[in-house]
Design a protein with these regions (language model features):
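Phosphate-group recognition and catalysis centered on beta-loop-alpha active-site segments
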Residues: 1-263
């Protein structure tokens, strides 16, 4: 873990609000299913690294999870200090709470636990949304779960690594014609900066072609790490001036002023 430079814990409503206040267009959050079938927002595979509890999210009810301190285990010096201990009690939100807190914001929902039932519960919430709210949601996760969601909806923006790879390989073969394969419709694409120039029409035409089929292009730093972000002013200079899509960052507080000057 890095030494804290701000007072926010990930996957909490205060940290999401801070991101939006700094100018984020979309915020990413992680979902896991609780023992009582609620969608908790939490990243780690188990609770013991962040909290004082042990086990998985699915072993607890949401009421029990609300009692935990999600800042309990945060340490940047091997356990000498715990700067967030005592400050994260009750901060683990549900998806419903996030949706209520940000009723008009775009959200990127990452299903973390790989449990098919999690996708079913999530779909129950998505299908009850208005068309406008539905269009603000994007979901990514494992191959089987995302394929199942595609069966439920042809228009929900989705992403899995297999889906993305298949669609982009097709595009590499035919993109010179301007045609966008149906495999790339209604998606989110995480495109590594190092490989992006291989795509036909990159950057401007490619982004426009994807936008025309309801696909969001997210540029990530480096060579393919899923959430490698443009987290320094220097890294932002590597973004092509003509790029009009989305940029992944884990430090919008640092880079938003630089990104804003590019617009």
């Amino acid at each position: 873990m890095d030494k804290p430079e701000h007072p926010y814990l990930e996957n909490t409503i205060p940290s999401m609000r801070a991101a939006f206040d700094h100018g984020a267009d979309v915020v990413d959050l992680d979902l896991k299913l609780t023992k009582d079938q609620q969608l908790a927002v939490f990243h780690d595979a188990t609770l013991e690294y962040r909290t004082e509890a042990k086990g998985e999210i699915g072993n607890y009810t949401m009421t029990e999870l609300k009692q935990l301190d999600i800042g309990y285990g945060y340490t940047a010096d091997g356990g000498k200090t715990f700067p967030f201990r005592g400050k994260g009690v009750g901060l683990m939100p549900t998806l419903d709470e996030v949706l209520t807190a940000f009723p008009h914001k775009d959200l990127l929902l990452h299903v973390k636990d790989g449990n098919h039932q999690t996708y079913e519960v999530l779909w129950g919430k998505l299908r009850a949304m208005t068309p406008e709210r539905f269009n603000q949601m994007t979901v990514y996760g494992n191959d089987d779960g995302i394929a199942w969601l595609r069966q439920q909806s042809a228009t929900l923006r989705l992403c899995s690594k297999t889906m993305m790879k298949a669609g982009l390989l097709r595009y590499l073969a035919v993109g010179w014609t301007g045609y966008v394969p149906h495999e790339l419709h209604n998606m989110e694409l995480h495109i590594p900066r190092r490989y992006a120039p291989l795509l036909w029409g990159w950057p401007g035409k490619f982004v426009d072609r994807m936008a025309a089929v309801n696909t969001r292009v997210m540029l990530v730093e480096g060579d393919g790490q899923w959430s490698a972000g443009f987290d320094t002013e220097e890294s932002v200079t590597q973004i092509p001036p003509q790029f009009g899509g989305y940029v992944w960052t884990n430090r919008i507080d640092r880079v938003q002023p630089v990104l804003a000057r590019r617009r």
